[in-house]
Amino acid sequence: MYGIEYTTVLFYLISFILVSYILKTITKIMDYLIYRITFIIVVLSMLSNAQNYGINLPITGSMDIAYANSTQNDNFLSSTLCLYYPTEASTQISDNEWKDTLSQLFLTKGWPTGSVYFNEYSNVLEFSIDPKLYCDYNIVLIRFTSGEELDISELADLILNEWLCNPMDITLYYYQQTGEANKWISMGSSCTVKVCPLNTQTLGIGCQTTNATTFETVADREKLAIVDVVDGVNHKLDVTSTTCTIRNCNKLGPRENVAIIQVGGSNILDITADPTTSPQTERMMRVNWKKWWQVFYTVVDYINQIVQVMSKRSRSLDSSSFYYRV
């Protein structure tokens, strides 16, 4: 009997020692894996470019203000700059090597060759649909054209902010806007948007839901329209669907690595009156219109002052990421 008890005690003792050894071994293996993974993550994070949201210091005022024209001591070896310009600029300059010339001039301001990218667009519509804001800093040159002030101001509102959008099926559903940040954005070669506000019985308020000619017109033959209606009220919409698309969008906040330079025009377009623009400052400026060479020379001269008051953000997105995101 005593032999059986000793055997039982010995069995439990050996089992305890064996389990303890297994647990210690597992603990050592886990510690090794955790330290190894942590070490790899630290090394990779040091080698990669981390996001830098920066401080919100948007560009204010216009280029008519006397800025200091100086060359920075610090160059931008790790930054990229995208300069967007209309087709008419390259057409007027008519020089196959003009981009190389500008690259050499940017080099005198501390921007290495290969860090500045020149991107051409044909019109406001094309650029608003597919801006490709890929660089650390993105500067858009927009020629002021009489009669297109509304398209330009709405393009500014679109690309200076980030939007989260969903498609709208206006043939099946009524839609309402839930707050000041909620807008309907339509794009196309010719966008006419009409709305009919509805009461709680889904009857038209001042309009007939079955007759689009009685709807209120909120956008008429525009390339880009950001539509704002009364919040909390259902609306039936009528849109020229053959030449236009419309989406339900929410403004998420400022896109701080984008600035707009308005070329020409008596006054700078102001988008700060929109209560959804927060903070109430703007990243738009104006340069006097002369010739496109003169415009580019001015941009080169003041590029470092412009960039210093922008925020470099490595998550620059194109339209598929910020406009058509669902």
Curated annotation (Swiss-Prot):
Region listing for GPR motif, in residue ranges: 253-255
Gene Ontology CC, one term: host cell endoplasmic reticulum lumen
Region LVD motif, residue ranges: 237-239
Disulfide bridge partners, by residue number: 82-135, 165-249, 191-244, 196-207
The UniProt record lists the keyword Glycoprotein: yes
Keyword RNA-binding: no
Sequence positions that bind Ca(2+) 1: 95, 206, 214, 216
Glycosylation-annotated residues: 69, 211
Modification after translation: N-glycosylated.
Gene3D superfamilies in the record: Glycoprotein VP7, domain 1, Rotavirus outer-layer protein VP7, domain 2
Family stated for the protein in its record: Belongs to the rotavirus VP7 family.
Physiological role: Calcium-binding protein that interacts with rotavirus cell receptors once the initial attachment by VP4 has been achieved. Rotavirus attachment and entry into the host cell probably involves multiple sequential contacts between the outer capsid proteins VP4 and VP7, and the cell receptors. Following entry into the host cell, low intracellular or intravesicular Ca(2+) concentration probably causes the calcium-stabilized VP7 trimers to dissociate from the virion. This step is probably necessary for the membrane-disrupting entry step and the release of VP4, which is locked onto the virion by VP7.
Subunit structure: Homotrimer; disulfide-linked. 2 Ca(2+) ions bound at each subunit interface in the trimer hold the trimer together. Interacts with the intermediate capsid protein VP6. Interacts with the outer capsid protein VP5*.
Protein's recorded name: Outer capsid glycoprotein VP7
